[in-house]
Every structure is written in structure tokens, then in C-alpha cells.
């Protein structure tokens, strides 16, 4: 057999194989016969000479296939029983259950550690072999071509984002029709822009500036006006951005500004009824007074009319009493007590005005037509306590109670006096 294999001619002789090749061929035949013929042949013979020729051809094919087999490094090597490092193997279970995760560390033994180390070394060998196969051509970008400057995508994008600029040959009517077809919202937005801008400029802004400048308390009406001012200015700024995009002839159908304008438009429609009915008339009246130069203050809405009337009456009476006698301290005390009483009455009246009328005792108890009972019998605890007290009184009449000694005689504390007699005489 030639090393190149180009001048190889098949022959029917067994002399071409050496002992090592015959052993390999015999092993290969046994492996092929095992799955197909479980019964081993003891004395096999052939009746025809043609079978020998067929066997020779089969041997040649087996040797050629054996030489190409990935499990054999080469016929001239001594390590014929070692598998090739490039061989994938024939067992699928080899490629499963080889990785370890966190929960597998508890059952990690020395054998598995050795297998993991061998797997790591094999991976490093494969990585090194792949790195050796790479050349400088693998790191070049020869097969990646740059897109041309005037690509079709850019042309399509320019057609999408820009409107046709050839309007010189169109009439005024055709221009209006083109504008209505391409941007029907343009006229509505421009009208809203002018209307809201005038509202902010002529009414909302002057009033709010005066309020902030003179530290006027922000009552709910002014807070609502400030909210309307913020919403309208935001809407006008978005409309201005929309007009800027239209001036640059950029298509705004898919632009986020359209969605934002719709949201602000809905919010303005929600605020408009209350603003037109309540807030705007008050702002107009307030603006007239500001322009006239009238000085005004915002009253405390928490004050009640009844309380103001009572305090005014008391102040008038107090001024009269103070003017008559300023040095009388008793009158001052009486005035303070009267003021306190009047304030309490005003507080009660204020509570009565705010709260509902309370229910009566009969409504709360809801007894109906229950029979009258003594007060002592209403509470069982009080009832049994009274019975016990009466039983003690009856027992004292039948059985004498035991009287314990209060204090024993401990001798005279200051000595014995001859003229003092404290003994008890026995009467006969």
C-alpha cells in the first residue's frame, strides 16, 4: 500500500496485510456480526470458490473503511486501541449529566471531582485547537460590504418623512385641498392656539400675577384658574412644536406630539364647563377691580354670619361700658365672662348651623310601651347589692355580731399617778 493511496490496486491476496491489520480487521468483523447474528458459527465452510472472492473484496472494503474510521489514529501507530480526540463517540449519555449546579455540591465526591477536572482540561484543549485553526483572514471584514450612500432605504425614508415641495403649479383651491387631505387637524389646532393664547394673555396671566405679587391667599377658585393656566400654556407650546414640524415639512402623523395634543385637548374639555360657568366670571370681575386700582382683601370663608353678629353686638356694648367706667375691675371681669359666654353661644350656634338636629332620648332608647320599673331594678348588679345590704341588717337582729378587741393595754406611758383611779368597780 502506497502512502499517498493514488497507485493502490485491490487484490484478492491476504499477503498484503500484516498481523496487526488482520487483528484489527477481525475485531471489526466481530463487532458487525454481534447485532445481526447472535448465534456464533462454529464450523463454517463454503461450497463455492466464488465466495472466497466475495470475502476478499469484503475484506478490502473493511480495511479501507477501517482506515477511514475515526476511532483509529493510523495503522502504523502503536496506540491503535486509543480513541481519536476528534471523535464524538457513539453514546448519547456521555453528553448529559456532566455539569454541576449549586444543589449538586452536597453530593460531590472525589470521582466526580476528577471527572470535572478532566472535562475542564478537555475543554481547554478544544479551545486551544480552535484557536490554532484561526488565521488572519478570520478577523477581516472582507465579506462585509458597506451600504451605498444613496441606498433605497434612505430614499424611501425621505419620501415618507417629507411632503412634496412642488406646489408652484397648484392653484389656491388645490393647495387647500392638499392641506385638508394631508393634515386636516391644522386649521383646528391653529384656531385653538390663537383662542387659548388670548385667554392666557388677557385674563389668566394678569390675575395670577397680581395674586402672586400681593400675596393673596390661593382660594379654590384661584387654584382652579392656575390649573387652567398650566394646561392651556402646555397645549399652546405643543401646538407651536407641531407648527415647527410642519414648517420643516416633516410628516407628523406618527409623531408623539399628536398623541400629546389629543390628551391635552381632552383635559381642556373636562375643565371647560366649570371654568366657563363659575371661574371666568369671577376672574373678569377681579380683573376689572385690579384695573380700577381698588384695594381688596380675601375674606375668610370659615367665618359664620351668626358669630360675626354676636361679636359686633358685644363689641358695641363693651365700648359703652369701658367709656363709662375705665377703672372698675369688676366690670372688666364681667366683660370677660360675657365675652366668653357669647363666644360659647356663637360656637353652639355655629355647630347647630353645620350639624343636623339631634334625636331625643325617647328616639335613642326606642323603648316603646314597656312597663315602668324602679331605677334599682334596672341594673341586676345594683339590685343584688341592695338585697345583700338588707340581709345584713336582718342578721344583726338575730345574731350578735362579734366585736374584736381594738387595742390591748400596754401599761402607762407616763408613769403611775397615786391620785388617779382607772379601775372598774364590781358591783354586788
Curated annotation (Swiss-Prot):
Biological processes, Gene Ontology terms: chromatin organization; maturation of SSU-rRNA from tricistronic rRNA transcript (SSU-rRNA, 5.8S rRNA, LSU-rRNA)
Which stretches does UniProt call biased (Basic residues)?
Answer: 370-386
Tell me which residues bear Phosphoserine.
152, 323-324, 337
Protein origin, superkingdom: Eukaryota
Region ranges (Disordered): 1-93, 317-386
The family database entries (Pfam families) matched by this protein are listed as:
Sas10, Sas10_Utp3
As for subcellular location, the record says: Nucleus
Q: Where is the composition biased (Acidic residues)?
A: 15-24, 46-62, 324-336, 344-353
| Molecular function per GO | RNA binding
Which key words are in the record? Chromatin regulator, Developmental protein, Nucleus, Phosphoprotein, RNA-binding
List the GO cellular component terms: nucleolus; small-subunit processome
Q: What else is on record for this protein?
A: Transcription utilizes two promoters. Promoter 1 gives rise to the short transcript encoding Sas10 only. Promoter 2 generates a discistronic transcript of Sas10 and Rnp4F. The longer transcript becomes an RNA duplex which is a target for RNA editing via Adar editase; Rnp4F (not Sas10) is edited.
Family in the record: Belongs to the SAS10 family.
**Role, per record:** Essential for gene silencing: has a role in the structure of silenced chromatin. May be involved in gene regulation during development. Binds RNA.
What is the recorded name of this protein? Answer: Something about silencing protein 10
Q: What is the lineage of its organism?
A: Eukaryota, Metazoa, Ecdysozoa, Arthropoda, Hexapoda
